[in-house]
Amino acid sequence: MAERANLVFHNKEIDGTAIKRLISRLIDHFGMGYTSHILDQIKTLGFHQATTTSISLGIEDLLTIPSKGWLVQDAEQQSFLLEKHYYYGAVHAVEKLRQSVEIWYATSEYLKQEMNSNFRITDPSNPVYLMSFSGARGNASQVHQLVGMRGLMADPQGQMIDLPIQSNLREGLSLTEYIISCYGARKGVVDTAVRTADAGYLTRRLVEVVQHIIVRRRDCGTIQGISVSPQNGMTEKLFVQTLIGRVLADDIYIGSRCIASRNQDIGIGLVNRFITAFRAQPFRAQPIYIRTPFTCRSTSWICQLCYGRSPTHGDLVELGEAVGIIAGQSIGEPGTQLTLRTFHTGGVFTGGTADLIRSPSNGKIQFNEDLVHPTRTRHGQPAFLCYIDLHVTIQSQDILHSVNIPLKSLILVQNDQYVESEQVIAEIRAGMSTLHFKEKVQKHIYSESDGEMHWSTDVYHAPEYQYGNLRRLPKTSHLWILSVSMCRSSIASFSLHKDQDQMNTYSFSVDGRYIFDFSMANDQVSHRLLDTFGKKDREILDYLTPDRIVSNGHWNCFYPSILQDNSDLLAKKRRNRFVVPLQYHQEQEKERISCLGISMEIPFMGVLRRNTIFAYFDDPRYRKDKRGSGIVKFRYRTLEEEYRTQEEEYRTREEEYRTREEEYRTREEDSEDEYESPENKYRTREGEGEYEILEDEYRTLEDEYETLEDEYGILEDEYRTLEKDSEEEYGSLENKYRTREGEGEYEILEEDSEEEYGSSEDGSEKEYGTLEEDSEEDSEEDSEDEYGSPEENSILKKEGFIEHRGTKEFSLKYQKEVDRFFFILQELHILPRSSSLKVLDNSIIGVDTQLTKNTRSRLGGLVRVKRKKSHTELKIFSGDIHFPEEADKILGGSLIPPEREKKDSKESKKRKNWVYVQRKKILKSKEKYFVSVRPAVAYEMDEGRNLATLFPQDLLQEEDNLQLRLVNFISHENSKLTQRIYHTNSQFVRTCLVVNWEQEEKEGARASLVEVRTNDLIRDFLRIELVKSTISYTRRRYDRTSVGLIPNNRLDRNNTNSFYSKAKIQSLSQHQEVIGTLLNRNKEYPSLMILLASNCSRIGLFKNSKYPNAVKESNPRIPIRDIFGLLGVIVPSISNFSSSYYLLTHNQILLKKYLFLDNLKQTFQVLQGLKYSLIDENKRISNFDSNIMLEPFHLNWHFLHHDSWEETLAIIHLGQFICENLCLFKSHIKKSGQIFIVNMDSFVLRAAKPYLATIGATVHGHYGKILYKGDRLVTFIYEKSRSSDITQGLPKVEQIFEARSIDSLSPNLERRIEDWNERIPRILGVPWGFLIGAELTIAQSRISLVNKIQKVYRSQGVQIHNRHIEIIIRQVTSKVRVSEDGMSNVFLPGELIGLLRAERAGRALDESIYYRAILLGITRASLNTQSFISEASFQETARVLAKAALRGRIDWLKGLKENVVLGGIIPVGTGFQKFVHRSPQDKNLYFEIQKKNLFASEMRDILFLHTELVSSDSDVTNNFYETSETPFTPIYTI
C-alpha cells in the first residue's frame, strides 16, 4: 500500500490515442504477457463503469448550439451581399457560386468547433458527447449533422448545390432540404451495397500480389536509402511516425560526433535526439537516410534491415515472417470500413477553404502595421498579409484580449477598427498542396427573364462556329438583358407620349419573329410593312393585312435570315453579324433590284477577319423552289468564243426578254403541254411562285431587260465554290461545255455551243474592261473584282471550298466562267434500312404515291432504289420516258436546249425549255435501254453588269489600304443532289463583296458605325479600320470618355468614305425608315444611315407633294438650331446633350432633333382610343399591332433636380447603361437599366439585368436577340479543384493500386522535368546523368504513390504504416518492359521482367539491355509473377496454365500460395528453416570486401549528398551483385 500511495494520480480523461500510448509503453517496460493482464483489468473496469452509468441516447440529449442562430444569420448576410453584387453585375455566376459555397462551408466548420466547446462547457457527461468524442460510436461530423447544421450537399454529379441545409436532424428538415439531402443518402445506401464486395476483392488482389514476400535474410547489403528531413514541410508527428521502427542506411553525425550508426534500428529515444538536434540547428542538420523495402536488393523476398521493426512487438522482424500477406491485409481491411463512409459534403473541399479567426469580444483591435502588407483576398476584398506570426490585441472596456495570428494569414480588418464579438478578423491560409489538380468545368448561365440581349464590348466569333451564333468574349464585360414583355395585343397597353407630342414614325417596337415570313405556303406575304405613297388622305396602315409587299419605299432590314426564311431549322443562317441591306438611288431607279437583295454584313462592334464577306446580293431569281430537291449542273465557257458571239447573242437576248414576261404568265399552261407528266403541278422556279411576291419589281420588266442581271454568292458553308481559274482542271475546251462527273449514273456530256447566251451588255468592255460609271480610283482594281484575287476566298470552311489559285495577270484566253446552270427536279428520300417500301425499283409512279408507311411522293416519275449499308436511298426522277428505236443516236446525260426538235421522238412542236436526257438500262438486258427526258430549269449567269451599281466602288478605298473585291459563288456542287429543306428557298448564286487589306501583320479589321459630330451636326459612317489603329474621333458605344468632336476639315475631304459620292440629289422617300425587325425596334433615319454622303447633313423628312422621292439640295449644312423636347418644349441647343444615333439605338422613343423649317415638323396626335392609332399632320392614321409592348413597370422615372441638371449632362446620354446603386446625383438609382428617355427634369430607365461575363466565356445568341426566360445566355469555362473525395475512400485507393490514371497531369510537370534534366548532369558530371536520372525518377514515383495512398487513408482517419504500402508499391513498380530498340539475346522485346533481374542479366552478358520502367496495376502484377500456379489460382486459370505449358515454365514453389495449392509446407515460420543453408561468416566477409571498393563509396557520397532534389534510392553502382540463393532453387528459367 505504501508503494501505491507514492504513485501520481493523473486526474485526466483518457481517449483512444492515450490508450494506444499507454499500451505501447507497457509493452516496452513489461513485455507482452504482463501487458495483457493489465489490459484485462482495464477492460473489466470499463465494462463495469459503462454498466453503472447505463448510457443511453435520447432525443433530449441532442443539445442545439446556442451560437448557431447568429452564425447562420451572419452567413446569410454575406450571401445576401453576394447576391446583390451579382445582381449589380459586380461578380459573375462562377464567383458567386464559389464564394457562397465557401461562406457556408466555413460557417459549418466553425459551428462544428463551437459544438465541441459547447458540450465540454455545458454538459461534459452528455451521452452524445461521451460516445462520439471518446470514439466509441459516431464521429464529430455525424454529431454535427444531428445538432449543428447539415451544411452543403453535392448533387449526383458531384457539383455543390449552393443552397445549404441550415437545419439539423434534431430540428427537422424542410421539404426542399429533405430532397436535397436524399442525394447523399441514396449514394450512401448504394455504396454500402456495392462496395462491400469491392473491398473484399481489393484485399484478395493485394494479398495475391505480395503473398510470396517473406523475410529471408538479415541484410541484403544495399547502400541506398530514402532521405527524411523535417525541413521538407513534414509535420513533427509524421516525422516521428516515419522514423520509428526503421533502420538507418547511413551514419548520422551532429557536428563531428556520430550519434547513430548504419544498420541501427530507430527507437523513440533516438527520434527525440534527432528532433532536439533539428530544433537546435535547423539549417545545419543533415537529412536522415533510412532503409525501406524499396531499397532492398533482393528480387522476390525482403531482408530484415530493409523492413525494420515488426509493428506488433518492437523488435526487428523475424526471419520467415510473411510480411507480404500482413501488408496486403493491413491495407485491405480498412477498405471494408471506408465503404460505409459517404461524407455529407460529397467531399468537394480539398483544403481550399480557410479557417477563420473570430474576435473574442467587442472592442478596438490593434496590431503593428509594419508587420503586415496590404493585399487582396482571393475574392478581391482588401486585406493585410502577415509576414510573421502576429500578435493582435483587442481592447474592450475592462479587459484586454490578445490573439495570435499565424504567418501567411490574411487580416480582414484595419488597425484601430472597432470589432464586434465573433466578427471574423483573420483568415488562416490552408496549406495548399503544390500539385493541386484542377479540372475544367462548364457552367451555363440561363436568362432569368424575357428580354433582349446587349453586350458592351467587342466579341469574337468562335472560329469553329463561323456561321453559328456563339461568340467568345475577349475581355471581361457585361451582358445586358433589357426587359420586354411578350404580349401580342392590338391594344397598346402603355404609351409614353402625351397628346400632340412630337415623335418618330412608328416608334413602337415590333417583334421581328412575325414580320418577314416568306416561308408561308401561299405566296402572299402576311405583313404589309409600309405603304409609302399616300393615295388617299386617310389611308389606314395596318401591320397585319395579308397584302402585296410594297417595294419602292426604300427601307432597310437587318438579317437576311429574316428575309429568306425564319425557320428555326436553319441554324446555319448567318446570324452572326448585322446585315444591313443597302438602299439605292433615284438615279438607279431603272435598275430596280429587289429591295431585299443586297445586304451588308457588319459584325456589331466586331472584328472583321481577313477576307471576310462584307456585303452580298442574293438575286431572288436564283432561288430554288421550295417544293423539291434536285440537281444543279454547270457549264463553263471560254471568253474568246464569248467575244465572238456577243453581238448576235445580244440581239436574240433582247427578243427573249420581250417574251419573258408572257412566259411568266403562261408558264403554268405551258408546262402542262410541254411535259405530259403529273409533274406539272410543281411549277419550276422561274414560274410565278416567286414573281407573285415581287410583283412590284417586275411590273415594269419590259423597260428593264438590260439590267435584269444575275449576281451570285455563297450560301451555307457546306458547299463548294467553283474554281474560277480552272484551266488546270478543265483544259481549255473552246467549243465544248462540260459538266463535272456526277454520281456515277451521269456520264460527261458534250454538246454544241451555238445557243449560248452571252452577256446582255452591249460592249465587251463593260464586262471585262473598266467600268464607265465607276469612280476613277477603282478602275485598276476592277478586273480583279471580277475574277478574284489569289487568296480571295480563304475564309470559307476548310473542306467545303476549293481555294482560288488565281494569278495576278488574267489571260482572257483561258478564263472560263460558268455561264449558266440548270436545276433538274428530282426527289430523294433517305429511309432507314428496315423500312418496307411500297414501290418497286424501276417502277413508274404518279404524284402522291405512298412510298412507305408514312412518306408519300411529291413528284411522279421513275423510281430508283439503292440499298446502302446504313440506309436505303429512294430517288424519283420526274419527266417523260421514251423507248428509242435506234440505240446509237442518243447521248446519255445531254442537256438539250430549247428551239431544237428531238430527232427520235414523235413530238414535232418546238420546246421552249431545256430538257435533260438520261439513258437508263433495262434490267437483265444488255442492249435495251430507255431514255428519261426531264425538264430542266436554266439559270443564266451573266457577269455583265458589275456590282458597281449595287455596291459603290469608292467605298473604303483610301482608308488603311482596304481592298474590296467581288467574288461570285455558286452554292451547290455540280450534279450533286440538293436536299429539300422544309419551308426554305435555297439560294443558288450569291455575289459577295470581300474585304481584304495589304498589311500582313494585321489580322483583323474593326467594323463599326461611327457617329461623327461637329458643332451640332451628326453624321454616321461605316468605319472599317485595321485593329490596333483606333482613330480617336470615334465615340465608342456608351463610352463617355472620348469626346466625339473632330475638326471640320476632316469631313470636307473628298475621299471621305461617302456612300454615294456622285449623288448631288439625296433621294429620300417620304418615309425612309429602318425597321429593325429581329432587333425589336423601328426607327426612322432621315439620312442614309450607313454612309452619309460627305456633303449632306442629317436632313429631316420632307413633305413635298410634287417630288415625293427627291429633295433639291439646299445648303446642306443647316445648323440645327433648336431641339424640340418631348412635349414640344423648345430646349436651347446644348452641345453635349444629343441623342446618339447608332445603328442600334435602343427602342427609339427618344428626343429627336429637327431642322427648324416649317414643313419639316412632323407632329403626331395620339388618339386616346381603344385601338391605338396615330394621326400625323397629313391626317394619315396608323394602326399598331405591337408584339412587344413596354409595360409601365419596366420603366423607372428618375426626376432630376434643377440644380443638378448641369452636372448630370456630362454623365447621362441616351442608351447608356446604368447599374443599380450608382450614385449619379443626390439619390441612388434603384434599379439597373438603360436610359431611355431624357426630359428636362427626369429621365426614364428601361429595366435591364446585367450579367458579368469573364474573358473567354461563350455568349449564345446575337446582339439584340430576344431571349425567353430560361434560355441559355452564356457559358463559363472555369477551373475547379478536382474533388478528391467524390471517388472517396476505397475507389480512390483502388484506382492508384490498379495504376489507372485518375488525375490530369500536374500543370508544371514539364517544367520540373526540364529543370531536373538540367541539374542532374551539372551535379553528377555528364556521363552518369541520365542513368541516375532514370533511376531517381522510378524512386520518386514510388514515393509519390505511397504519399497519395496515405493521403486518402488519412483523410478517412485511418492510420496505416508506410511500410505496408511500400511493399505493395514495390511489387507494382518493380517490373520493366524490354524495349525493341536494343534486341538482346536473352529477353524477347515486350517481355515483362523484374528490374533487378534485368540489371543482373546486363552485367552477366556484358551487353546493354534496353528496357523502360512501367507501372503495373495489382491485377496485372498478380498475373506476372514467377509462379504460374499462383497466377492460375488467381484468374484465367485455363489460359495461364496453357501458356505455361507451351512455354515449358518451371515453378520453384517460392511463395505461400503455390505450396498451399500443392499441399506442401509453406516456407514461412518454422517451415522457413529448410530454405536456409548459409553461414553468417560468408556474409560478413562479403561486406568487408565490398566496402574496400573506393569507387563505390565515392559514388555513394555523391548520391547521398544531393538527394534533397528528390528522395533517391538509385542503384547506380553496378559493381555490387548479389550472390544467388541456395543452389537447389534457381529462380529464373528462361
Curated annotation (Swiss-Prot):
Q: Which InterPro entries match?
A: DNA-dir_RpoC2_beta_pp (IPR012756), RNA_pol_beta''_euk (IPR050254), RNA_pol_Rpb1_3_sf (IPR042102), RNA_pol_Rpb1_4 (IPR007083), RNA_pol_Rpb1_5 (IPR007081), Rpb1_funnel_sf (IPR038120)
What are the binding positions for Zn(2+) in this chain? Answer: 220, 296, 303, 306
Q: What is the lineage of its organism?
A: Eukaryota, Viridiplantae, Streptophyta, Embryophyta, Tracheophyta
Q: Pfam families recorded for this chain? A: RNA_pol_Rpb1_4, RNA_pol_Rpb1_5
**Gene name as annotated:** rpoC2
**What Enzyme Commission number(s) apply to this enzyme?**
2.7.7.6
Q: Disulphide bridges in this chain?
A: none
Q: What catalytic activity does the UniProt entry give for this protein? A: RNA(n) + a ribonucleoside 5'-triphosphate = RNA(n+1) + diphosphate
- Which species? Saccharum officinarum
Its name, as the record gives it, is: DNA-directed RNA polymerase subunit beta''
